[in-house]
From Swiss-Prot:
The gene is rlmH. This is Ribosomal RNA large subunit methyltransferase H. Specifically methylates the pseudouridine at position 1915 (m3Psi1915) in 23S rRNA. GO terms for cellular component: cytoplasm. It catalyses: pseudouridine(1915) in 23S rRNA + S-adenosyl-L-methionine = N(3)-methylpseudouridine(1915) in 23S rRNA + S-adenosyl-L-homocysteine + H(+). It is found in: Cytoplasm. S-adenosyl-L-methionine binds at residues 73, 104, 123-128. Keywords: Cytoplasm, Methyltransferase, rRNA processing, S-adenosyl-L-methionine, Transferase. The lineage of its organism: Bacteria, Pseudomonadati, Pseudomonadota, Betaproteobacteria, Burkholderiales. Transmembrane segments: none annotated.
Amino acid sequence: MQLVIAAVGHKMPAWIESGFGEYAKRMPADCRVHLKEIKPVERSGSKTAETAMALERAKIEAALPKGARIIALDEHGKDLTSVQLAQLLTQWQQDGRDVAFIIGGADGLDAEFKKNADMLIRISSMTLPHGMVRVLLAEQLYRAWSITQNHPYHRV
C-alpha cells in the first residue's frame, strides 16, 4: 500500500519541503508517503472559483493511483484523533488499496470531488496555510504508523 498526498500548489518554501521530507522518510517501505504536486489553475477575471476548482479536479484525478481510496481534506470533514487515524491506517493496510489524501487549492476542492470521496477529514478547525497542511498530514501519518507499531514516538 502506498500513501499519496496530492496537493494543489507548488513552489513551496524550503522549510515546508524539509518538514514534509523528514516525516516521509521515516515511513517504512511498505507504507511510503508520496507527494504529488498539482499545479494550481490560474485565477483570472474570466475564470470563476468553481471553474478553477473543476479544472483542478481533473488534474487531481489524473494524478491519483487507479482504485485508490480517496480521503479529501476539507474544513467540514470529520475530526480524527491520532489513534483513530492509526486504526484506519491498520484497516487500509489490511485491504491493500492505495490511499490518496487530497489537499485542495486556495478555493478548496470541487463539490463533486468531495461528494465522490470515500471520506472527508479535517486537520484543524483553524485555517492553515496549504503547505503547512502537507507537513502536518505527513507527521500525523507517521504518528499513526508509530501507534500501530507501539513505537515510542507517540506518547499518551
